[in-house]
Amino acid sequence: MERQQIIESLRRIIPTESTEYNERLISLGESFLEWSKYKHNLKATEELCRPYMAAHLACELLSNDLNLEINLLATPIPKKKYYKLFTYFQEILSPLTKSLAAKDDLMETITYLCTKLGGSTAIPYVKQLVKAVVTNDMRIEHKRGIIIAAYLLVSAKAFGKDELHINHTERRKAQSVLQDTSSALQIQYWMHVLSESWQYKEIPLNGIEGYESQKQRIKPWSGIASMIQIDYEKRLQNYPIWKACIEERIQYYKSQLEKDGTAS
């Protein structure tokens, strides 16, 4: 539905004899439309402008690359009011537009993500995995999902963990960095696909030199904070034992209560 809304809006903004529009343009418009629903509330009377503004913003961002001639003769509401609404729409989504513009190149996106999350030594491995699966005709959101899946796989292998078990904390961080809206199931699907590639099998287990120490340095701890972190990690490791003990106690007290009830 969102895709069709963007295509309909593009027909009004960049009229052309062709019935097909650049896939990159459509995907970008879809991203703006989807994210605007979380970032920008509109009045009921203004809601019909949302897909139009998302398509308009995508056209503005890619006008030079795609040599687009933008035509705003058929705005959904009077032009003066529309321009005021669109200006605010741009401001709200400016962090997203800047990040998408800066990270349009896949390899740059990978470098950006890994560096942002403190795993720059993983960059070449993530790039290898992404190249193994991504094709030029893929939609932007699918490419972002693949990048995140590749990052999670490499990160897990570097720490010697179960590669196909999603670390949801890391996933959410990565998705936040790339403004990605893929579901956990979609990410997991791509992880399975990538794990079958020979590029993945060639990554050495625990073999990414400096990765673990680098990840630890990204958020330095000092003094009491460091002690709290270490204590937390120990407690986390002991959680299954603690849980079993608690459950055993609960069962014991339940049985005692049942005995008391029977005796009375």
Curated annotation (Swiss-Prot):
Q: Name one GO biological process term.
A: DNA replication initiation
List GO terms (cellular component aspect): chromatin; cytosol; DNA replication preinitiation complex; nuclear origin of replication recognition complex; nuclear pre-replicative complex; nuclear replication fork; nucleus
Does this UniProt record's set of keywords contain Transmembrane? no
Q: Give the subcellular location.
A: Nucleus
Keyword list, A-Z: DNA replication, DNA-binding, Nucleus
Record-linked Pfam families = ORC6
What GO molecular function annotations does the UniProt record carry, in alphabetical order? Answer: DNA replication origin binding
Subunit relationships: ORC is composed of six subunits. ORC interacts with cdc18, recruiting it to the ars1 origin of replication.
- Family, per entry: Belongs to the ORC6 family.
Question: PANTHER family, alphabetically?
Answer: ORIGIN RECOGNITION COMPLEX SUBUNIT 6
Please describe what this protein does: Component of the origin recognition complex (ORC) that binds origins of replication. It has a role in both chromosomal replication and mating type transcriptional silencing. ORC binds to multiple sites within the ars1 origin of DNA replication in an ATP-independent manner.
Q: What is this protein called?
A: Origin recognition complex subunit 6
Q: Which organism is it from?
A: Schizosaccharomyces pombe (strain 972 / ATCC 24843)
